């Protein structure tokens, strides 16, 4: 989490007022939750590499997670339970490694690092009860020897600034980080999460309280920092205590602030839902609209209907040098015994399969080769 905040805030000018810690210190313990998923078979040995873990890497990891719908459901449900009882430090899942930080790879499919100051017995019982229906194995819920002491600070007279991004551990929420000053090498402030649909309300609430509001915008394949608001005339933020910026996040309580009466339209979003798709899986003989941005080609409309989830195109070698920017129509075919597709019409240049003649139209199968019943999974013909 610390690495994520550092990366998100790296391009913003933050307050540099020197703060002095108060006498109060927040003491926290670390807990590691780990388990294997039953009947989960996956291996990326010799292929996987992720040296930095930028916000773009985090968004890519969340995109990869969409390809594992069942596993995502389990992990996301557990995260929602933990958010109400502890602070999430990081998540590990075999296909994408550590979600926000850099660490050694564990031996289990899933690891969740949390820090907490409540009862471990209560947390452990909730975890065990939640995972019971999913037949996970090698479940471990253990505290480490790592103890964290988080300094607290009184709110200074300096004007804070805010950065808003997606919350990496649950994209149903946004992360709101307020920066007030520095202590030693650490920035000090307070962090909140709020349901993503409350973003316009949060911005309007913060405007009279911040010198500047920046938002990390998801632009599919890249991110950018957008300045939403800046001012020199602000009111004092209604909180008494700050901490070093860390894993500690609070739920944003809108009832502590006046209700906004107007809202500024936003043409950007911290997180855009997306899913990887093969062109083979798209419907045949209908118009499809695609856009290319930041080296990523993605689909926004099918048959003149706007999609709720952006579809990121997974290209094969045949189309690796083509840029999907415009409209196209495709059809699935059996070509030389292979189930594939061809683009039959497009507003942009693409290579074509000249001949699709196949009298027998027999497709090579990966298994069940003697069966007269033929179909495909997402990966195989059978």
UniProtKB/Swiss-Prot annotation:
One of its GO terms (biological process) is viral process. GO terms for molecular function: DNA binding. It is found in: Virion. The keyword DNA-binding applies. The keyword Signal does not apply. Induction: Expressed in the intermediate phase of the viral replicative cycle. Keywords: DNA-binding, Virion. It holds the Pfam family Pox_I6_C. GO terms for cellular component: virion component. It comes from the Viruses. Binds to the hairpin form of the viral telomeric sequence. Might direct genome encapsidation into the virus particle. Belongs to the orthopoxvirus OPG082 family. This is Telomere-binding protein OPG082. It comes from Variola virus (isolate Human/India/Ind3/1967). The gene is OPG082.
